[in-house]
C-alpha cells in the first residue's frame, strides 16, 4: 500500500480500513452498515475505555435504553421531530400484523430518556442526574454513505443526558462536557476546533449547540462531537418535574452530548500515512510486535526464538499488549509491512546481535526509524517513547490543522480559499440573513469560535458591510 492520503484521501481511507482489518464496509448487504472485525473491535473498545473512564470519573452513570421509540414519543417535542423525521427508520409491522403505533429505530434518545426521567425524578435532591449510554443509532442517510463518516447504522454512539435544577446548572454541565471531550481528543492526539453552531444549524430542540470539528487530510471538515443545552424544551412536554428546595415544583433543565464512530474515523485519517494506520499506544490493539530475524544455523535460530519469547513474556507481564510473530512462512519484510499497516507503535527486531549483546533494536511507527535499547531498560524506555510518540503525533496533527485555517475579510477571498479546502474565518454582523448567504455562497458556517477570541472589533461584515460582531468559521464539510 503506497497511497498518498492528501492526494486521494477517499481511496486511501477505504483501503486502510479494509486492509488493516479495522472495519469491513461495503460487503454487508445493507447500505450504510459495516462490520467491526476483531482487530477493529479491539481498537473501538480501547477508545471507549477512555470515554467511559472520563465520564465515570465525573459522576456520569451508564444506562441502556431500548432501540425502539414509539412515534408518539418522538412527536412530543415538535422541533425535534421536524429535525429528524426524514432520517428515521420506521418499524411498522410485527410479523404479518400492522403495528398500532409505528416504532422508530433510535435516531437519538432525548425523547426516550426524558420520558423515563419523568418517572425517576421527583426532588431536587436527585439532581443533577447524569446518565450516558453507548449504543447504535440509526439515520436514513440519503446522501452517499461513507465508512465511519456517514452511516445508516452508527454502531458506536455515546450519548450523555443530564438533568439540572437551573439554566445555569445545565450551562455549567455543557462546560464540563466540553472539557471531557477535550481530554478525549487530547489522549488520541486529534486536533479540534470548538465552535458554537449558528442558530439555524443547532440540534433540533436545543437552545444552543457547541461542536468539535477537525480537518481531514483532503481539507474537508468533519464534526466529531457535539454538546447541546436543551433548556426545558423536552422536560416540559414530557413533564419532567421536581420539588424544589423551597417546596415549589419546576421543570428540569437538560443537556445532551454525543460522540460517534467519527472519533475513530478521525483517529485513522489524522494520523495515518502511506504505510497505513499510525495509532497512539494507549489505543493500539497491539502495542509491541516482536519479529525474530531468521538464522541459517539451527542452534542460532533456537537462541533467537528463545530471546524473542523471553522478551514477549517480560513485556506481557508488564502489561504491554504484545505479539510474537514467529510465522516461518513470512519474511521479516512481509511482517514489517503487515504490522505497520495495522499501526503497531513499536516493533522489536531480534537477531544474532540482539541475542549476543545487551541491547534490543526497536522501530517506532511514527518516526520510521530504529533505536537501540538496553534489555534491562525496555519497559521504561517503551513508556517514555509512548509519551513522546503521542506528543509527536499530536503536535504534527495540530500543525497541519492550523496550517489549513485562514482569516480573511471578503467573500471573494473566502470563496477562493474554501474551494482550495481551507477553513476560513471572516467577520460577521450576527444576522441570520448574512449567515445564510455565507452558507449558500461560500461553504458551511461552522459557527463562532469558542477556542479563541471571536470578537471582531473594528471589522466590517464580509456580506453587508455593517459593523461586525464576531468572526465565524466556514468550510467544506462531510
Swiss-Prot record:
It is an enzyme of class 6 (ligase). CDD domains: ProRS_anticodon_zinc, ProRS_core_arch_euk. Its main location: cytoplasm. One of its GO terms (molecular function) is ATP binding. One of its GO terms (cellular component) is aminoacyl-tRNA synthetase multienzyme complex. It catalyses: tRNA(Pro) + L-proline + ATP = L-prolyl-tRNA(Pro) + AMP + diphosphate. GO terms for biological process: prolyl-tRNA aminoacylation. It holds the Pfam family tRNA-synt_2b. InterPro entries: aa-tRNA-synt_IIb (IPR002314), aa-tRNA-synth_II (IPR006195), aa-tRNA-synth_II/BPL/LPL (IPR045864), Anticodon-bd (IPR004154), Anticodon-bd_dom_sf (IPR036621), Pro-tRNA-ligase_IIa (IPR002316), Pro-tRNA-ligase_IIa_arc-type (IPR004499), Pro-tRNA_ligase_II_C (IPR016061). It is found in: Cytoplasm. Keywords: Aminoacyl-tRNA synthetase, ATP-binding, Cytoplasm, Ligase, Nucleotide-binding, Protein biosynthesis. Its EC number is 6.1.1.15. NCBIfam families: proS_fam_I (TIGR00408). Homodimer. Catalyzes the attachment of proline to tRNA(Pro) in a two-step reaction: proline is first activated by ATP to form Pro-AMP and then transferred to the acceptor end of tRNA(Pro). Belongs to the class-II aminoacyl-tRNA synthetase family. ProS type 3 subfamily. Consists of three domains: the N-terminal catalytic domain, the anticodon-binding domain and the C-terminal extension. This is Proline--tRNA ligase. It comes from Ignicoccus hospitalis (strain KIN4/I / DSM 18386 / JCM 14125). The gene is proS.
Amino acid at each position: 500500500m503506497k497511497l498518498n492520503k492528501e492526494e486521494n484521501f477517499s481511496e486511501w481511507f477505504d483501503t486502510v480500513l479494509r486492509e488493516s482489518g479495522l472495519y469491513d464496509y461495503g460487503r454487508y448487504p445493507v447500505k450504510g452498515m459495516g462490520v467491526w472485525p476483531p482487530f477493529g473491535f479491539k481498537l473501538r473498545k480501547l477508545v471507549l475505555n477512555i470515554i467511559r473512564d472520563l465520564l465515570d470519573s465525573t459522576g456520569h452513570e451508564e444506562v441502556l435504553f431500548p432501540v425502539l421509540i414509539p412515534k408518539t414519543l418522538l412527536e412530543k417535542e415538535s422541533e425535534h421531530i421536524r429535525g429528524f423525521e426524514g432520517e428515521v427508520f420506521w418499524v411498522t409491522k410485527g410479523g404479518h400484523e400492522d403495528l398500532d403505533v409505528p416504532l422508530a429505530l433510535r435516531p437519538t434518545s432525548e425523547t426516550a430518556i426524558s420520558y423515563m426521567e419523568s418517572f425517576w425524578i421527583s426532588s431536587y435532591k436527585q439532581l443533577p442526574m447524569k446518565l450516558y449510554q453507548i449504543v447504535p443509532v440509526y439515520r436514513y442517510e440519503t446522501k452517499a454513505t461513507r465508512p465511519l463518516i456517514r452511516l445508516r447504522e452508527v454502531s458506536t454512539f455515546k450519548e450523555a443526558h443530564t438533568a439540572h435544577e437551573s439554566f445555569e446548572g445545565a450551562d455549567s454541565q455543557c462546560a464540563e462536557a466540553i472539557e471531557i471531550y477535550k481530554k478525549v481528543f487530547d489522549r488520541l492526539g486529534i486536533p479540534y476546533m470548538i465552535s458554537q453552531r449558528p442558530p439555524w444549524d443547532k440540534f433540533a430542540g436545543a437552545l444552543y449547540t457547541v461542536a468539535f470539528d477537525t480537518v481531514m487530510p483532503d481539507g474537508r471538515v468533519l464534526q466529531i462531537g457535539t454538546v447541546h443545552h436543551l433548556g426545558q424544551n423536552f422536560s416540559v412536554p414530557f413533564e419532567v418535574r421536581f420539588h424544589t428546595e423551597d417546596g415549589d415544583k419546576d421543570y428540569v433543565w437538560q443537556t445532551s452530548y454525543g460522540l460517534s464512530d467519527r472519533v475513530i474515523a478521525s483517529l485513522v485519517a489524522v494520523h495515518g500515512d502511506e504505510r497505513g494506520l499510525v495509532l497512539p499506544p494507549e489505543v493500539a490493539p497491539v502495542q509491541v510486535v516482536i519479529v525474530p530475524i531468521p538464522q541459517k544455523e539451527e542452534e542460532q535460530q533456537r537462541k533467537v526464538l528463545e530471546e524473542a519469547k523471553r522478551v514477549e513474556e517480560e513485556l506481557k507481564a508488564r502489561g504491554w499488549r504484545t505479539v510474537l510473530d514467529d510465522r516461518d512462512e513470512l519474511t521479516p519484510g512481509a511482517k514489517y509491512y503487515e504490522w505497520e499497516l495495522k499501526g503497531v507503535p513499536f516493533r522489536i527486531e531480534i537477531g544474532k546481535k540482539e541475542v549476543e549483546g545487551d541491547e534490543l533494536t526497536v522501530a517506532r511507527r511514527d518516526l520510521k526509524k530504529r533505536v537501540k535499547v538496553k534489555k534491562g531498560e525496555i519497559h521504561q524506555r517503551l513508556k517514555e517513547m509512548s509519551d513522546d510518540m503521542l506528543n509527536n503525533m499530536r503536535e504534527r496533527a495540530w500543525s497541519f490543522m492550523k496550517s489549513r485555517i485562514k482569516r480573511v475579510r471578503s467573500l471573494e477571498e473566502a470563496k477562493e480559499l474554501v474551494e482550495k479546502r481551507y477553513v476560513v474565518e471572516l467577520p460577521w454582523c450576527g444576522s441570520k440573513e448574512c449567515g445564510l448567504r455565507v452558507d449558500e455562497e461560500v461553504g458551511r458556517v461552522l459557527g463562532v469560535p469558542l477556542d479563541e477570541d471571536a470578537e471582531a472589533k473594528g471589522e466590517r461584515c464580509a456580506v453587508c458591510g455593517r459593523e461586525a460582531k464576531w468572526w465565524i468559521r466556514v468550510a467544506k464539510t462531510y
